[in-house]
Amino acid sequence: MPHNIEAEQQLLGALIRNNDLIEKCNNTRLNGEHFYNKFHGEIYDKINKSLSSGKTANIIFLKTFFENDEEFDIDQYFEQLVINAAPGPAIEEYSSLIYDLALRRELIYTTEYLQFSSFDLSQDDITANDIIEETENKLFQ
């Protein structure tokens, strides 16, 4: 599936480092669902929600929402995000890239649905027009 984990990490690091950059992400309609890594999507949503309510989104604030476990050190992960943060001017480009890759994944899922549904003749009550209509709905959501 199309994705770019490094772009996700660098974008999150930049947002944690400089909360004002969220406006550049909002220009691209990016939200947590667009992240390939679901954990990154959760972090993005927490940042966005925090900033929308007038709070800051720094490491200390964010790590309260995510638990450490034996295999994963959340403190170290957030520190690495900030250390490897993208430069501010690249944020809109990274945001657009993450959004575009999410749309591409959605296109792949939709074409898989279209192909599977077209071959599935076991449901007599579903016509080709029904499949086309459902595919159009998925594409234009």
Map each language-model feature to its residues.
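Noncatalytic partner-interaction/assembly domains of nucleic-acid and motor enzyme complexes
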Residues: 1-103
